[in-house]
């Protein structure tokens, strides 16, 4: 990646073993010690799982980090497991697990009917995602995604694609904010149109969405017997009538966090102040509210823009 070599973005970059590798922690600890690193922003999902597991097993980390409990992280990075925990709440769409080698594939997806939405149960950036119109398309999609061990099929939801960010710290929900993903960077290279990187989005004020997200998180915390601690992005998709359903819960910041910050939702700064024990930080709950009509535009290797939707060229 070009930007890894840009000294204006990073003081130093390293190539390290992947999370889970036997030499991973030795290298991470060496870097932390060498640079006296006090805090880490841990992502993507595999890194979060690895760090959360280390914290659970060892009781400490090389430096401070805001992490969910390990069991909770496991449940949330598996979309099938997360959906199953919430299946009786009305907050998730009707869904079925799809085993690629199953002899009852047609019978399984018949519960949903066509079209439906398919994706991998784990992974990010829209891995394995497609609107499936018929059985032939389903079988072809499974065939060209041989590395996906399990899919989840869900009711097709044609409405808005929403995200609700939630910052929990030591048992309290402290900050929240919402946005809409409208278009994706390089959308044409993915059959589903979803690449995981938003190119055009809206910053929204949606207290009802926050309410649903926090109720769902309450159940997920309880199921995992986990403390309310960590940073989460709850993704929603609306049906044709505008009813939102939870499609996944990310255990990390998402790519357009900088756009939230530009609009005033400074989650990264909040996290640093909390981890640093800043006594002046206001721990009363706050949903960040944005000015009306705010949108953001992003692209590869370019600074994002924040402007009003009314300013877009017609």
Predicted feature residues:
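Glycine-rich phosphate-binding loop signature in dinucleotide/nucleotide-binding domains
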Residues: 31-37, 111-112, 146-147
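ATP-dependent carboxylate/phosphate-activation module, predominantly the ATP-grasp catalytic core
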Residues: 155-161, 165-222, 250-275
């Amino acid at each position: 990646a070009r930007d890894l070599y840009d000294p204006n973005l990073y003081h130093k970059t390293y190539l390290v073993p992947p999370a889970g590798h036997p030499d991973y922690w030795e290298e991470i600890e060496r870097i932390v010690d060498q640079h006296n690193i006090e805090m880490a922003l841990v992502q993507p999902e595999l890194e979060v799982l690895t760090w959360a597991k280390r914290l659970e097993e060892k009781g400490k980390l090389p430096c401070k980090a805001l992490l969910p409990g390990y069991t909770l992280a496991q449940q949330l990075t598996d979309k099938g497991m997360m959906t199953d925990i919430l299946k009786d709440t009305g907050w998730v769409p009707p869904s079925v697990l799809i085993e690629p080698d199953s002899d009852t594939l047609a019978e399984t997806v018949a519960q949903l009917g066509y079209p439906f939405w398919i994706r991998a149960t784990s992974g990010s950036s829209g891995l394995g995602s497609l609107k499936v119109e018929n059985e032939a398309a389903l079988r072809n999609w499974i065939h060209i995604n041989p590395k996906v061990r399990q899919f989840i099929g869900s009711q097709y939801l044609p409405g808005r694609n929403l995200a609700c960010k939630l910052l929990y710290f030591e048992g309290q929900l402290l900050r929240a904010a919402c946005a809409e993903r409208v278009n994706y960077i390089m959308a044409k290279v993915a059959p589903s149109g979803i690449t995981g990187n938003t190119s055009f989005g809206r910053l929204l004020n949606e207290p009802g969405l926050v309410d649903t997200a926090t109720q769902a998180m309450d159940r997920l915390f309880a199921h995992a017997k986990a403390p309310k601690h960590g940073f989460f992005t709850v993704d929603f998709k609306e049906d044709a009538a505008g009813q939102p359903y939870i499609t996944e819960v990310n255990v990390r910041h998402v790519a357009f966090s900088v756009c939230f910050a530009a609009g005033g939702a400074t989650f990264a700064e909040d996290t640093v102040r909390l981890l640093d024990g800043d006594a002046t930080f206001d721990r009363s709950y706050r949903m960040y509210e944005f000015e009306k009509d705010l949108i953001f535009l992003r692209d590869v290797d370019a600074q994002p823009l924040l402007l009003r939707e009314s300013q877009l060229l017609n």
